[in-house]
Amino acid sequence: RNDAKELSLVGIFKLRGDGRSPNRRIAFSPYLFGGVALLAHNPKAKTPDSPEFDNKWVALQPLGTEGQGQPGYAKPYSLVTYSIPFGAGFTWKINAEWNISIEGGFRFSGSDYLDDVGGLFPDPTVLKTPLARAMSNRTLEPISARTGQDRTDIVRRITQPNADPSVDPFADPLGGWQQGDYRGSPTRNDQYLLSSITVSYILPSKIKCPPIR
């Protein structure tokens, strides 16, 4: 998971005219939007369900799961980046004072580490702690840390064409998930979707003030 926070500057283009005053706005108004945003994020994952690690959520960036910060490896990735939001939505007029809007937006981010995965599997001996080594390569975990379910069948189907039930898929290191293999996709940054429902109150165009006595 990632606890992401976004501060955006967005412009809206309405596909239909919306009237010259709040009282004359149309009943249904589609729109497009786009802009720029500042994104603060903090990827986390659950540790293995074992006495050593206690199956708890931990922040991944300080661990350097791809060797970040060690000699010969990249520096730690930033937890602040940008994103490019764009999308579309619809606004419905409920009555003279209230609107409801539904929109969906796509975000191109400036980071490939919203999920802490972007480069290659590192040499495990350079990682700083046993926790960093455990979180760097999780392919041999028989139990899913997040759900608590057994991973044996799904790993067997992925790694063995015939899915032989007599073979333990965790007995040997899995090919393609070892030092120097791609851990993520280094050719493009991470992207994400965001949807929202908004209820808004329309201020009257003229506010009548009580007479001064």
Language-model-detected regions and their locations in the chain:
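Extracellular loop and loop/strand-boundary signature of outer-membrane beta-barrel proteins
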Residues: 1-4, 19-21, 70-76, 182-185
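Gram-negative (and chloroplast) outer-membrane scaffold detector with strong preference
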Residues: 1-58
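Residues that define the transmembrane beta-barrel architecture of outer-membrane proteins
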Residues: 3-7, 28, 76-84, 191-195
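Residues on the lipid-exposed face of transmembrane beta-strands in outer-membrane beta-barrel proteins
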Residues: 9-15, 34-38, 86-92, 102-106, ...
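Outer-membrane beta-barrel "beta-signal"
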Residues: 12, 188-213
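Short loop/turn motifs that connect adjacent beta-strands in outer-membrane beta-barrel proteins
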Residues: 17-29, 94-97, 205-213
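Outer-membrane beta-barrel proteins
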Residues: 20-22, 41-46, 99, 110-115, ...
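Flexible glycine-rich, low-complexity coil/linker segments exposed to the extracellular/periplasmic environment
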Residues: 47-48, 55-70, 125-190
